[in-house]
Amino acid sequence: MSTTESIASSQTSLSSWRKSDTTWTLGLFGTAIGAGVLFFPIRAGFGGLIPILVMLVLAYPIAFYCHRALARLCLSGANPSGNITETVEEHFGKTGGVVITFLYFFAICPLLWIYGVTITNTFMTFWENQLQMPALNRGVVALLLLLLMAFVIWFGKDLMVKVMSYLVWPFIASLVVISLSLIPYWNSAVIDQVNLSDIALTGHDGILVTVWLGISIMVFSFNFSPIVSSFVVSKREEYEAQFGREYTERKCSQIISRASMLMVAVVMFFAFSCLFTLSPQNMADAKAQNIPVLSYLANHFASMSGTKSTFATLLEYGASIIALVAIFKSFFGHYLGTLEGLNGLILRFGYKGDKTRVSSGKLNTLSMVFIMGSTWVVAYANPNILDLIEAMGAPIIASLLCLLPMYAIRKAPSLAKYRGRLDNLFVTAIGLLTILNIVYKLF
């Protein structure tokens, strides 16, 4: 085959779309759509209409460029079957491997704490408002919920993974159905409150600060970084030997782009539908109550006077149940990653990396006790979930998703061709702005 024919074949292949590409597009999309999405409308709608319109413009670039940067880092390793830890070790040595292990663990573990608080608050809200039952002791509720999840994890891990995979699409479908079903309840409150003469760019409630804080929740909600390494390995094994690495990179970018479009469309439609049904004041109230937006919607419809429609009655009960299922799904998914990361840290620093010195059962037990114990402490303390996301969850995700790839592009010879690009500045800015939230929360 001539060079011209080879290039033509490669271009034709890029335009073709395989079943595996669709599978991975939906897989990336499904990974990102979880419990974090239930808090995005609260932060996005907190400042009113103009900030959420700005976030709408930023949503796709944040989702696409940041995940593409991480995918390029994963693609830069010499071994097509090597994961991100191996690739970082290749570029930066064993120290880099330790750093990435820490980053992965501390990027996921705080999410479990967030979900621990969320599931406790969601259950207690459902118990008191929808079931009209007397208030329960918070510590006992958190402990029982965590023990229930620990029991399921310990005795039914394989079943849990299978059930999680089945729950992804019903949850996404429920978000779309709820978004559409809320349309008859839309009102103009958020538009009526727009007064151009009162709009401030700066200040605590200004547009810039609101959007800045909104970037953190976007990084948190539009995040499928945990699966990017596996995705890249799969695509390299499928395409690289036949078409080369450059083609594989373009194919990965194409898949990430389509997954990002799907994700942004579903999440932003859900956020706008919630905002037009409620109001910025309602969103502030939801933040103060420390509950996800579905729980607040359930309480909102429960407090409606007069004869309720069938949908209002269904949503009153269904929204909290959907939220509970979503949080359970997200907790289980992130627990597996946290367990793997903590097991690796204990093995590396407690047993010098010697797997023969400790059984997997003992390792899993030690990790479970720490994970569930720390989650219970945080759930009992009940810190504000959005503050926890903005000060801890999102900054650590940003360091892995945004700053690590940018540092690698600057230092690694195999990534030199990506230097000096405008999208690198954008990804770096998103990472730094997200991390600077820590300073804002402190002062």
Curated annotation (Swiss-Prot):
Instruction: Write the record's keywords in alphabetical order, separated by commas.
Output: Amino-acid transport, Cell inner membrane, Cell membrane, Membrane, Symport, Transmembrane, Transmembrane helix, Transport
Q: Where does this polypeptide localize?
A: Cell inner membrane
Topology relative to the membrane = Multi-pass membrane protein
Recorded catalytic reaction(s): these are: L-threonine(in) + H(+)(in) = L-threonine(out) + H(+)(out); L-serine(in) + H(+)(in) = L-serine(out) + H(+)(out)
Transmembrane helix in keyword set: yes
- From the record, give the transmembrane residue ranges: 22-42, 44-64, 97-117, 140-160, 163-183, 207-227, 259-279, 319-339, 366-386, 389-409, 423-443
Q: Could you cite one Gene Ontology molecular function of this protein? A: threonine efflux transmembrane transporter activity
HAMAP family in alphabetical order: Thr_Ser_transp_TdcC (MF_01583)
Per the similarity annotation, which family is this?
Belongs to the amino acid/polyamine transporter 2 family. SdaC/TdcC subfamily.
Role description: Involved in the import of threonine and serine into the cell, with the concomitant import of a proton (symport system).
User: Per its record, how is this protein called by name?
Assistant: Threonine/serine transporter TdcC
What is the originating organism of this protein?
Answer: Klebsiella pneumoniae subsp. pneumoniae (strain ATCC 700721 / MGH 78578)
